[in-house]
Amino acid sequence: MREKLNQHLETFIGKELFDIHLVCEMMCFEFGDMALHAQSFTRILRNDEVLVTTLDYQGWDEIDDKNNDEWYNMNQFKHLIIGNKIERIELSPINDLFIYLDNGVVIQSFAANGPLHWGYCNEQWRLLIGSDDLEEESIQIVAEGKNLEYFDKV
């Protein structure tokens, strides 16, 4: 499984980050016919400075949920993030995912589950590969805690 995943990760090299969408504490990164949906703790760095994190969503004005730090920070820094190409992509032994862009931006998505005894593994991130309709006809690689699941094209 890990070898197959690494082959698919290699196909991300050179892809341009076209857009980012925020959904509560989830970040969705679009790379043309490929995407990353990050549901675990995710942060975006540039030159060793944190630009935005999924936890920033929790800092809000308590009146309008659109007034939160995640969306504010993304609006401030989006021009530094999108439009750049992937130079390198790494997967740690515990399924932390690191994407390095050609302008010094790093996208980090961390596996957030420890050993589970009573709960279940939550989806950490999902890679969608190879289709314009990414939800329907794509190869999907899903990290759930320490487990990786691979789904071939539907």
Protein language model regions, located:
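Surface-exposed, interaction-prone regions used to assemble/regulate multi-protein complexes
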Residues: 1-154
